[in-house]
Amino acid sequence: MAGINDREKALENKFAHDQELKFKSMARRNKLLGHWAAGLLGKDKDAYATEVVVADFEEAGDEDVFRKLRTDFDAAGVTVADHDIRTKMVDLLAEAAAQIEKQS
């Protein structure tokens, strides 16, 4: 019985660890995305990155972040295709995950 409990505890710990890595990776991705977008928008990188990170708490998934960028690009007259924004989001998530793994 102890073996089953140990395995269950190990699975719970792995799940918690994986969720923490996912959260950290998404937050890092949003920061990197904010820096990228700020460069295109002519805004302060750190301040805008914070806005992007905060925008991600509006709803689950990436749509809130995408909408923030799309709205801000449109308002500033910056031409970036939806596909390019989504591709950058995917690319920066991979980069962020690699950075987080490297730090762990």
Regions found by a protein language model. Give the residues of each.
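A charge-rich, low-complexity, intrinsically flexible signal that marks solvent-exposed coils, linkers
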Residues: 1-104
